[in-house]
Amino acid sequence: MNPLIIKLGGVLLDSEEALERLFTALVNYRESHQRPLVIVHGGGCVVDELMKGLNLPVKKKDGLRVTPADQIGIITGALAGTANKTLLAWAKKHHIASVGLFLGDGDSVNVTQLDEALGHVGLAQPGSPKLINMLLENGFLPVVSSIGVTDDGQLMNVNADQAATALAATLGADLILLSDVSGILDGKGQRIAEMTASKAEQLIDQGIITDGMIVKVNAALDAARALGRPVDIASWRHAEQLPALFNGTPIGTRILA
């Protein structure tokens, strides 16, 4: 069975209750299914806390974090360090054998600079599946942070939705984007069960989909097109539904190519 990538986002990394629910769902799923799982994560809340503690400004452009050269080390420490190891600690607590990685390990995802105006922000492209496939074949849960590296050795902060998309293309995997919201909401706050590119463009034009959700929807649309299969956006809050979601039952918004 093809692997499943679960991209973690929102305040999940900041909530012990959310992490407990997630890892309990992962344990339950792994006990009854053979499907290999991969976690990809960002950690914006971890970065924001660190930046605030250091009195550094947080600047975003089109939903993407501007990352100056003097901040990439801090952001790498927060994402590939604190956020990644926090997830590994929760996996250990739940007796799941896991391995912490960043996008550059084994050239799993290739990264180039996205835009000079954004600084050390990377564009992710599919890379080599060898390392992660080897880990999956041996029963490990790879936990991959959204820090990448260019061919000339520059560390890059990559939007985690886009990183997960590139890794899904690398592995031929299905993709779920887990966030704080139960999916994409319409103008009345109701969940939209299915979303096409034309519907997304309409809601963006109407100002209903804004900011970071635009990045998330576009990443999901890109993923659906690249993978040739639907991509799910859903919430981690409904833990009892997560095993069904991991098995292909939509509980949030299903993005169609």
Curated annotation (Swiss-Prot):
Class of this enzyme: transferase
InterPro entries linked to this entry: AceGlu_kinase-like_sf (IPR036393), AcgluKinase_fam (IPR004662), ArgB (IPR037528), Asp/Glu/Uridylate_kinase (IPR001048), NAGK-NC (IPR041731)
Catalytic activity: N-acetyl-L-glutamate + ATP = N-acetyl-L-glutamyl 5-phosphate + ADP
Gene3D superfamilies linked: Acetylglutamate kinase-like
Function: Catalyzes the ATP-dependent phosphorylation of N-acetyl-L-glutamate.
Subunit-structure text: Homodimer.
NCBIfam families registered for this protein in UniProt: argB
Name of this chain's protein: Acetylglutamate kinase
Organism: Salmonella newport (strain SL254)
Lineage of origin: Bacteria, Pseudomonadati, Pseudomonadota, Gammaproteobacteria, Enterobacterales
Gene: argB
